[in-house]
């Protein structure tokens, strides 16, 4: 009996044939830079995909291993002169693995719970967050670390990346509308994410303050869902498509000039919802309209222009490019433009800022050793700048870099671009 078809578009011969094996992607690829193994380079992985997809070779343990080790950072797309859309190819390969490869019971159960039974349900995210918050604040975390039980279970490294759960969740802001300060320059709908609602509430609040301070009316649509990025990157395409449909139906009802996100990983997927649907599907045209209105908050503010007063910040700051902002959305200058607009800020470029920090969605949980290698290199470069603050544009990168600052004792603060803008704007407000 034939397996069911994979929903959505399928790569064709021409998509793979664009790769001419020139090798210009090699130095851009984090895993190739670490190991210098052809099979763990973009062109090496494409060669393996061709064997499976075009030559009908079986999916082997080796194939799965090399595809799993890819961060899907898409730096190879930036480097590629032939326009290979590697992200589409690797995510389809993962969808094939999801359908055809028998993972272990534990791996299959974990993936099924995370992608199909947790992320699509905000109330379950909140319930799990409350349990984690109890673990973090009751003293259990300190005890577990102190007696070595995490190390015994092989969880010590992964637990470093466990986000600090907020006291108040951002979900209570869903359904609210925030008026612009002064004349209204734009009306925007804010996409608040999923995990960010319980771990980055302050970032979401700062995003709203910065937008309203710069003349934007901000509506936070009620009952919005996870964007589906993590599911799409993992090859769980059915879950990603279901989430996309829900967000399309919700946000396309909003009368707004733009749909704003402060998460580069979410933004890349939101802009590319059409990649999840075939051209003949009704959702494809809806997804194209949705993507055309979606903007990263740094992209939107840089284009709109900052008009809020800002207090000088005497800080030396460096910026780590978020992969799905730089490589996925091709946005490099917008965050730098905003940082340079802050009075007295000393901005210094981070060496190799275009190389992934190792977060890559849940990569730091599934490929923890590799993630820590990339993080160690990133923190060495960050220390070389002598910056007091590392700035980035994605919550996942924030978690990774904050863990790096702790583990490597760099004594560097890690903030989102809008958090730094919010700090400067708050300092310029008259004291009541």
Residues covered by each model-derived region:
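N-terminal glycine-rich anion-binding loops that anchor highly charged ligand groups
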Residues: 24-27, 37-42, 217-220
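Iron-sulfur cluster-binding electron-transfer modules in prokaryotic oxidoreductases
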Residues: 86-432
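Alpha-helix capping and helix-loop boundary segments enriched in small/acidic/polar residues
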Residues: 17, 36-40, 58, 231-238
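Short His/Asp/Glu-rich catalytic/ion-coordination signatures at enzyme active sites or charged loops
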Residues: 54, 75, 79, 235
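Short, intrinsically disordered, charge-biased short linear motifs at domain edges
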Residues: 4-16, 57-67, 179, 212-215, ...
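Cysteine-centered iron-sulfur cluster-binding motifs in ferredoxin-type domains/subunits
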Residues: 13-32, 60, 64-84, 324, ...
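Signature of N-terminal electron-transfer/Fe-S-associated modules in redox systems
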Residues: 17, 26, 35-36, 53-55, ...
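Non-heme iron-sulfur electron-transfer modules
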Residues: 1-8, 32-65, 83-113, 410-420
């Amino acid at each position: 009996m034939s397996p069911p078809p994979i929903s959505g578009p399928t790569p064709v011969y021409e998509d793979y044939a664009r790769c001419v094996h020139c090798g210009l992607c090699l130095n851009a690829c984090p895993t190739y830079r670490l190991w210098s193994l052809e099979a763990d380079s973009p062109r090496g992985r494409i060669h393996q995909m061709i064997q499976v997809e075009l030559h009908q070779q079986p999916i082997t343990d080796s194939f799965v291993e090399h595809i799993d080790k890819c961060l899907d950072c898409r730096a190879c797309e930036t480097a590629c002169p032939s326009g290979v859309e590697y992200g589409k190819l690797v995510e389809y390969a993962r969808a094939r693995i999801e359908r055809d490869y028998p993972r272990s019971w534990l791996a299959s159960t974990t993936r099924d719970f995370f992608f199909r039974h947790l992320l699509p349900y905000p109330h379950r995210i909140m319930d799990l967050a409350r349990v984690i918050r109890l673990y973090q604040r009751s003293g259990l975390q300190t005890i577990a670390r102190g007696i070595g039980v995490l190390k015994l279970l092989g969880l010590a490294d992964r637990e470093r990346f466990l986000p600090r759960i907020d006291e108040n969740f951002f979900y209570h802001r869903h359904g609210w509308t925030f008026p612009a300060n002064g004349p209204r320059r734009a009306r925007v709908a804010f996409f608040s994410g999923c995990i960010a609602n319980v771990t980055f509430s302050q970032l979401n609040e700062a995003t709203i303050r910065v937008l309203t301070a710069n003349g934007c009316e901000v509506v936070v649509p009620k009952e919005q869902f996870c964007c589906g990025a993590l599911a799409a990157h993992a090859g769980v395409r059915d879950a990603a498509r279901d989430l996309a449909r829900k967000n399309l139906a919700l946000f396309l009802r909003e009368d707004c000039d733009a749909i704003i996100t402060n998460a580069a990983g979410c933004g890349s997927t939101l802009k590319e919802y059409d990649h999840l649907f075939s051209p003949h599907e009704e959702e494809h045209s809806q997804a194209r309209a949705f993507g055309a209105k979606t903007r990263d908050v740094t992209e939107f503010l840089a284009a709109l222009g900052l008009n809020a007063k800002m207090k000088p910040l005497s800080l030396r700051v460096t910026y780590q490019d978020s992969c799905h902002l730089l490589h996925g959305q091709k946005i490099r200058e917008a965050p730098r433009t905003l940082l340079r607009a802050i009075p007295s800020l000393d901005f210094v470029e981070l060496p190799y800022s275009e190389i992934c920090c190792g977060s890559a969605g849940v990569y730091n949980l599934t490929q923890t050793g590799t993630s820590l290698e990339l993080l160690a290199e990133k923190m060495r470069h960050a220390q070389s700048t002598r910056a007091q603050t590392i700035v980035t544009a994605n919550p996942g990168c924030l978690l990774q870099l904050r863990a790096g600052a702790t583990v490597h004792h760099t004594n560097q603060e890690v903030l989102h671009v809008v958090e730094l803008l919010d700090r400067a704007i708050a300092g310029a407000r008259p004291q009541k």
